[in-house]
Amino acid sequence: MPKASHQDLRRSFRALTSSNSCFHTASVFDPMSAQIAADLGFEVGILGGSVASLQVLAAPDFALITLSEFVEQATRIGRVAQLPVIADADHGYGNALNVMRTVVELERAGISALTIEDTLLPAQFGRKSTDLISTAEGVGKIRAALEARVDPEMSIFARTNAAIIPVQEAISRVQQYQAAGADGITIVGIRDFDHLAQVSEGITVPLMLVTYGNPELHDNARLAEMGVRVCVHGHAAYFAAIKATYDCLREQRQILGSESNMSATELTHTYTQPEDYVEWAKKFMNVNE
């Protein structure tokens, strides 16, 4: 079977987001997972920023991974991927000028779409990690991303977190990002369909929801009816791989019992030690949450 070009895959993604259906992402974190996802019939994959940090650094999701490290992993995936891959590009790795560089590098890596979020990252001295940048700065980042794009088929989605801001502010943000020219809007933190209807008021571009498996949002037909074209449930495949690796190596070492009763979440916590980063943030950055 002939290999699809990067532009072919970008066109495929645009066809998905132009349809009347809602598609669910496969978590892809390396070339093998991308191959498996395509073979199993997934229409779209996503390289999560948190997963890239775990895969490349064995570090928690504290915006520690650099653009170069993220792009290297995206390039490895893009070399073999036969399904469109979305890159969770976090905050674009800096200001609007950094966003332009991010877009250039991820486009060359073969990514079909990317998201740029308005979270204030990395965490700032004396500021909460859940703070958002101003809407004006977020608009500037989206405009910069569009300016930097060479292939018009690559999609650029603006992302915001509706869980930590009032509904009216969320509405204002997504409407302004749409007006800035974003190809789509990614929303985190939607509670239920009523909340989705409020926040997406006036939005005509495709929606991407990051639900983390929220049971209140499991009606796929209703998601599609409300303009959601991509749904991200999380990265279960990656965490299952961590668990399987641990259990396999544990068995090889002939440790009593073929499987441990440690969950993937517990294993991830054990090997990344996020509490260390929280303490360092308190100690060196005056961040107390």
UniProtKB/Swiss-Prot annotation:
Positions that bind Mg(2+): D88
Cofactor note: Binds 1 Mg(2+) ion per subunit.
Family: Belongs to the isocitrate lyase/PEP mutase superfamily. Oxaloacetate decarboxylase family.
Residues binding substrate: S50, R159, H235
Protein name stated in the entry: Oxaloacetate decarboxylase
Catalytic function, reaction form: oxaloacetate + H(+) = pyruvate + CO2
InterPro entries membership: ICL/PEPM, Oxaloacetate_deCOase_bac, Pyrv/PenolPyrv_kinase-like_dom, Pyrv_kinase-like_dom_sf
Functional summary from the UniProt entry: Catalyzes the decarboxylation of oxaloacetate into pyruvate. Seems to play a role in maintaining cellular concentrations of bicarbonate and pyruvate.
Subunit field text: Homotetramer; dimer of dimers.
Gene3D superfamilies from the UniProt entry: Phosphoenolpyruvate-binding domains
Assigned keywords, A-Z: Decarboxylase, Lyase, Magnesium, Metal-binding
Taxonomic source organism: Pseudomonas syringae pv. tomato (strain ATCC BAA-871 / DC3000)
Needed co-factor(s): Mg(2+)
Enzyme's top EC category: lyase
Metal-binding found in the keyword field: yes
EC numbers on record: 4.1.1.112
GO biological process: oxaloacetate metabolic process; propionate catabolic process, 2-methylcitrate cycle; pyruvate biosynthetic process
GO MF: magnesium ion binding; methylisocitrate lyase activity; oxaloacetate decarboxylase activity
